[in-house]
Amino acid sequence: MKGNTIITDTELKMDVLAELRYEPSVRITDIGVLVKDGAVTLNGYATNYCEKCDAVRAAKRVAGVRAIADDIEVKLPDSIRRTDGEIAAAAANQIDWSTTIPRGAVEVTVSEGQTTLEGEVEWWYQKNAAENAVQYLAGVTGVTNAITIKPKLAPGDIETALKSALARNALLDAKTIRVETSANKVLLRGTVRNYFEREEAERVAWAAPGVYSVENQLKVEWPWRRAE
C-alpha cells in the first residue's frame, strides 16, 4: 500500500517551474521561482501584462502551493507600446462592447500603462469581466480594479444560501469551510486543499445575492502530502 510523503520546497519549486514551462504563453527563461514553506514568489519579467497573469495562474494550479507573491515586472517591447491615450480609448471600447458590463458603469484611467478601473456594478462577475476585458490589451503594464459592488437586491439569508452553494459545489469540500456573515459582508475561514479551491470558494461567496464584501481567510493545508 502506498504511503504519503511531505513535498519539500525544492520539489514544489520544480513542480511550479514545470507548470510554467508547460504554459505556452509564458517565457520561462525570464521568470524566477522562490519557495519557502509552500509560499511561492515569482520574479523576473514578462513582455506583456497577460503573460504576467498567465504565469501567476499557472503557479496557482500546482498542488501544494499555499500562497503566491507576484514580483514579476512587465517590460514592454517597442512593438506593443502604446500611449496612455490609446490604451484608455481601447480599454473603454472593450468595456463598452461587453454584454456583461452595464454601459457607462466603469471609468478607465491610464498612467504609464497602469490601467485603473473605477465605478459601481451590481455583481462581482461584472467587476471581474471589466478587468478581463482590458488585461490583454497591448501597452497595458498593470490593472488596478477599484470597481465597487453595490447590490440592488436586498440581502436574504446569505449564510444559508452560501452554505448550500458550497455544499453542492463538486470542486469544494464544504465541511472544511466556515461561513460568517454580517449584513452584506461574508467572512470565509477554514482550510482548503489547494489555491484553486481557495479562489473557487471566494467566487461562490461573491455570487450570493446581496453580497458586497468578501474577506477570504481560507488557508491552504500545509504540509501538503504526495502519494509515494
Residue ranges and their predicted role:
Residues M1-E228:
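N-terminal targeting leaders
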